Amino acid sequence: MPVVYVNIFLAFIVSLVGLLIYRSHLMSSLLCLEGMMLSLFVMLTVTVLNNHFTLANMAPIILLVFAACEAALGLSLLVMVSNTYGTDYVQNLNLLQC
């Protein structure tokens, strides 16, 4: 396995461990999720370019669109929680029963 793939996989694992450790604040969780999506995007792009998959050229762009939608929804939820309760604790999400 080339060094590039190992480094990208390690970036994904570090983001996953960060998500598991720093799950009390919503902002930390969102940053870790964004790191995971970025490492998946880079891994998918490198794989498509190295293996010359012509049919999968749009897959990294589609993943990036889903990551942008996830980030927008996460930030809107963060704004709603912080305006309502004044903090960004994940435990406050259980109280948002609309």
Swiss-Prot record:
GO terms for biological process: ATP synthesis coupled electron transport. The chain crosses the membrane at residues 1-21, 29-49, 61-81. It is an enzyme of class 7 (translocase). Keywords: Electron transport, Membrane, Mitochondrion, Mitochondrion inner membrane, NAD, Respiratory chain, Translocase, Transmembrane, Transmembrane helix, Transport, Ubiquinone. It catalyses: a ubiquinone + NADH + 5 H(+)(in) = a ubiquinol + NAD(+) + 4 H(+)(out). One of its GO terms (cellular component) is mitochondrial inner membrane. It comes from the Eukaryota. InterPro entries: NADH_UbQ_OxRdtase_chain4L/K, NUOK/Mnh_C1-like. It is a multi-pass membrane protein. Pfam families: Oxidored_q2. GO terms for molecular function: NADH dehydrogenase (ubiquinone) activity. Its EC number is 7.1.1.2. The keyword DNA-binding does not apply. It is found in: Mitochondrion inner membrane. Belongs to the complex I subunit 4L family. Core subunit of respiratory chain NADH dehydrogenase (Complex I) which is composed of 45 different subunits. Core subunit of the mitochondrial membrane respiratory chain NADH dehydrogenase (Complex I) which catalyzes electron transfer from NADH through the respiratory chain, using ubiquinone as an electron acceptor. Part of the enzyme membrane arm which is embedded in the lipid bilayer and involved in proton translocation. This is NADH-ubiquinone oxidoreductase chain 4L. It comes from Ursus maritimus. The lineage of its organism: Eukaryota, Metazoa, Chordata, Craniata, Vertebrata.
